Amino acid sequence: VEETKNFLKILMKYYENFLKDYLDVDLLSEFKSVREWKNFNRNNSHMKEYYGEGQWLNKLRCYLHSKPFVKWVEEETEIDGLVIDSFGTGEGVSLMQTNDMLDSHIDFNWNNRIRMHRAVNLLIYLGSCRGGEFEIWDDKREKTLFEASPIHNSAVIFTHSETQAHGVRKITSGRRYSIRQFYYKSEATCENPHQSLYWYNPETKMPTNS
C-alpha cells in the first residue's frame, strides 16, 4: 500500500509491509532485548532513544545504505545525487510508549560532518499502539495537512521542509519503535570539473584525460 501526498513544499509517501523476509519480526525481537535506552525530553516531547548496534539493525542499515535502495529513494522522491552519512548523525531508534509524544518541530537541515544539506527522511515503524498519529502542519502550524496512524512494518518518506513542521501525537496505549534514516544532498558546484588527468607520455601517446 502506498499513499502519496504532495503539499508543494513536502513530498510525503506512506508504505505498508515495508520490510521483507521477516526482518520486521527479527528487529522487533532485537529491540525488546535492548537495555541501553536513553530518555529524550525536549520541549514537551518525551520518548526513549537507542543509538547502538545490533545484528538485525546492522543488517537493516546496510540495506538502507545500499546502492539499490538509495536509487529507489531517489526515484520515489525525484531527487538525484542523494548520499548517506556513514556515521549516522542524528539517526537511531525511538521507543514511544503510553503518554509519549513528539511535539511539532522542524528537523535540523545541515550535517556539519559531511557538509551537506538534509534532503529526505525515512521512518520505519515496528510494533503496535493506539494514538501516536504522525502529522504534518501548515506553515503557520494552525492546520494539519497530513495525518497517518503508522501500523507495524510501515514506513514514511518525506522531504525536508524549513516551514512545515511535523510531529507525533500522544501514545495512549501500546509500544511502537521507529527507525530513522536520513539522506543528504550537496548544492555545491565545481568551477572546473574533469576526469582523471595523467602526465602526457610521448612514447605511449597517452592522452591527458583517459
PLM features: residue spans?
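Charged, low-complexity, helix/coiled-coil-prone segments
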Residues: 2-20, 92-104, 123-126
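A structural signal for well-ordered alpha-helical scaffolds and beta->alpha junctions
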Residues: 4, 8, 12, 53, ...
